[in-house]
């Protein structure tokens, strides 16, 4: 498959380094544990079937894919995997049974369409997830898509993202429905509004920290009532730096950020994050203002509190199914309309989370037909 886009220089350097490390490993010049850590930080899991079978995890920031990316996933699935891929609950795409010697070429193919496996695994900042209706939800305060993209770009290859005490997960939601599930992530961001003195409202965010499930589950805690848009990225990085400074590096079972709530307490952990943010904002190296990614794309909502037809998010379906045709029944429970932008979202269900190469290509074709490139 031929793609004209040039590979990003940083990504090219990553791939060349992976090739060098792989050669050393295959020649017996690099010990297993060292290569395993390096491999994981590049999004490559070794499978347990023996041999050189690998699982490749591709980050899909906030779950959004372009047609050429879907087509490339189809090509890789057919050429290097088993003809299909798997969607994860954190908006990654996983390809199984890829042979270790093919990994560098798979990375090149992915990077040629703007995708990466970098930091998809290991003790890193994992994929930045977001509400699946971002930009189309009729109740969103902000379109979180450009904010998730800006966060992804800021933290990818960031020095603080490389060797954390444990993995670090961030998500975004555009409204209080919280489709991004902020309450059980290391950092959860929900778009909110606060009143101005002139009677208008200011859009911004409410940031939550140190949530998690599994052993020792904790609901995330609010950092402050309102975080201005200009301070979102430094707030997220401050939480990351605090975790890097104080997280448990001796026991991986107690290394996630939620454990700091037990060792420090909510108030002290909150205070340290806010102190770290203050230091960041005072640094001459910090770029002030709204991130360029957000300025270029805009973050206007699809339609705040707009009446929609047929069924808005979170409202039970009241349609009498016996009185309508099959299409109307499907539309009533599967279609969301964002009035302000004229957007329409329709759900498609992937059985067991698996998507075939033909289905990837079919989605790409639909996107092109609708002008969604």
Description of each model-found segment:
Residues 1-373:
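Peripheral terminal and linker regions in Fe-S/redox and tRNA-modifying enzymes
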